Structure formats: C-alpha cells, structure tokens
C-alpha cells in the first residue's frame, strides 16, 4: 500500500510466522496495537490479488468494541471505525469499474467522514458483508439504479 491509501492491517509473511494467521495477527499488533489476545479470529475470506500482483489472504476477527487502538506512526496515520449498519444501507459515494486480467468488477467506493474506502479494501469489505450479513452486494454487475 502507498502513503495516504486506506487499508486494513496487513503485510508480508515473515520467516518466524508459523502461518498466515500469525502474520495477520503480528501485523495487526505492529500497525494498530491490537495484540492476538484481543482478537477472536473467525475465519478467512477469498484470496485476492492486488493491483500490484500480491496475493492477499484476508482474515476476519472480532475485537472489543472500545479497544484503544495505537497507530504505529511510521505506518498508520489514523484508525477509525464505521458502523456495519452504515455499509449494509449501501451508502456508496460512487462505483469504480475495475478491470484486472480477465476480471471486470464494479466496486463500491464508500466515503466515511474524510475517508474513502475503495479498491482492494472495498472488495474485501464487500465479501465480508455478503458472507456475514447476506448483504447482497454484487460487484460482478453494474449497480441498479
């Protein structure tokens, strides 16, 4: 990810990581100060390839509602929360058409306060919303209306 881009915590697997879940938890600790003891990992989402050709394996976990996040200044500018209900109401600011290899996707861009949630982060978010809440957001077709 580049400076000023919004992203979930994550990074490359290190030699000392026993598996990708360990990587996800380590990166979450390093980037936002949420240690493994504060996360109940509930599963993974589909692997997705970033626009830079990096294979990403998203992990989903439950965290305490009022956890005091501590952003790592060298990596993270801010941490913010958005109510799930807001996404389920589909408050997209726009839809981005993304073509990558043989894929053509219609990805929502959500604007929460001054933050744009788009691209890979939005693709991961939409899969999570569809899996956990049956949101019915289809990114393979243009949005209705």
Name each model feature, range by range:
Residues 47-55, 68-74, 117:
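Acidic pyrophosphate-coordinating catalytic loop
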Residues 7, 81, 119:
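Short aromatic/basic micro-patch
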Residues 103-131:
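GST superfamily/GST-like fold recognition
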Residues 71-113:
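NUDIX/MutT-family hydrolases
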Residues 14, 64-67, 85-87:
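Short, charged/polar surface micro-motifs in flexible loops or helix N-caps
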Residues 135-145:
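Charged phosphate-binding loop/patch that engages nucleotide di/tri-phosphates or the phosphate backbone
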Residues 8-43, 83:
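The catalytic Nudix box helix
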């Amino acid at each position: 990810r580049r400076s000023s881009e919004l992203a979930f915590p994550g990074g490359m697997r290190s030699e000392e990581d026993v598996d990708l879940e360990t990587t996800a938890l380590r990166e979450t600790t390093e980037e936002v100060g949420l240690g493994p003891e504060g996360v109940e990992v509930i599963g993974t989402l589909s692997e997705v390839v970033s626009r830079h050709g990096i294979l990403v394996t998203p992990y989903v976990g439950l965290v305490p509602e009022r956890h005091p996040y501590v952003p790592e200044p060298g990596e993270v500018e801010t941490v913010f929360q958005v109510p799930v209900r807001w996404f389920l109401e589909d408050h997209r600011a726009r839809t981005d058409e993304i073509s990558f290899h043989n894929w053509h996707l219609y990805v929502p861009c959500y604007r929460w306060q001054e933050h744009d949630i788009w691209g890979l982060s939005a693709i991961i978010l939409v899969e999570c919303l569809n899996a956990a809440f049956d949101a019915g957001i289809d990114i393979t077709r243009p949005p209705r209306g």
